[in-house]
Amino acid sequence: MADILLLDNIDSFTYNLVDQLRSSGHRVVIYRNHIAADNIIERLQQLEQPVLMLSPGPGTPAQAGCMPELLQRLQGQLPMIGICLGHQAIIEAYGGHVGQAGEILHGKASAIEHDGQGMFAGMPNPLPVARYHSLVGSNLPAELTVNARFGEMVMAVRHDAHRVCGYQFHPESILTTHGARLLEQTLAWALA
């Protein structure tokens, strides 16, 4: 069971994540991204098995309140999982680029190809997932492993040594057929 601090980037999917995580027995506390990074770091230090989860949200990572600062200050110190905007923020924090995707997708199912490793172990390949995004990561640094793609688009990354990963898609959406299992396997990987 993980102690998850979920950074809410003011997105309606945040509470889908909360419900799914709590129904799996995880402890979840939620902080909005306008809270000072110092306050969030202090709260994380009080948790027994802390995981920082970065929610989806509108706009770009730079517009997401304290999220970029948290990523800079906490890299390598605790597991972090980013979803959609959170994934994009991870890519930028590690030196990658986030820009306009070739197509805008909101509420569309796509079949992604993955490497079958870590959080994707035992998952169907291709894996149907829900996509809601107009931005996509590119020019990734070598320390980020791309572990899922849709065509040439990066759909998931991980940093094994730092226990950091991100999903461009939404595992909490009903359109992601194995989303609950993927979140559980992700948390197990993050805390290993």
Curated annotation (Swiss-Prot):
Keyword annotations of the record: Amino-acid biosynthesis, Aromatic amino acid biosynthesis, Glutamine amidotransferase, Lyase, Tryptophan biosynthesis
Enzyme class: lyase
Catalytic activity: chorismate + L-glutamine = anthranilate + pyruvate + L-glutamate + H(+)
One Pfam family cited in the UniProt record for this chain: GATase
Record-linked CDD domains: GATase1_Anthranilate_Synthase (cd01743)
Pathways involved: Amino-acid biosynthesis; L-tryptophan biosynthesis; L-tryptophan from chorismate: step 1/5
Binding-site residues, L-glutamine: 57-59, 88, 134-135
The protein's Enzyme Commission number: 4.1.3.27
PROSITE patterns xrefs: GATASE_TYPE_1
Start and end residues of each Glutamine amidotransferase type-1 domain: 3-192
Gene Ontology biological process terms from the UniProt entry: L-tryptophan biosynthetic process; phenazine biosynthetic process
Single Gene Ontology MF annotation: anthranilate phosphoribosyltransferase activity
Keyword Amino-acid biosynthesis: yes
Active site positions, chain numbering: 84, 170, 172
Coiled coil segments of this chain: none
InterPro entries, per the entry: Anth_synth/Amidotransfase (IPR050472), Class_I_gatase-like (IPR029062), GATASE (IPR017926), TrpG/PapA_dom (IPR006221)
Subunit structure: Heterotetramer consisting of two non-identical subunits: a beta subunit (TrpG) and a large alpha subunit (TrpE).
PANTHER family for the chain: BIFUNCTIONAL PROTEIN TRPGD, MULTIFUNCTIONAL TRYPTOPHAN BIOSYNTHESIS PROTEIN-RELATED
Entry function: Part of a heterotetrameric complex that catalyzes the two-step biosynthesis of anthranilate, an intermediate in the biosynthesis of L-tryptophan. In the first step, the glutamine-binding beta subunit (TrpG) of anthranilate synthase (AS) provides the glutamine amidotransferase activity which generates ammonia as a substrate that, along with chorismate, is used in the second step, catalyzed by the large alpha subunit of AS (TrpE) to produce anthranilate. In the absence of TrpG, TrpE can synthesize anthranilate directly from chorismate and high concentrations of ammonia.
Protein name: Anthranilate synthase component 2
Protein's organism: Yersinia pestis
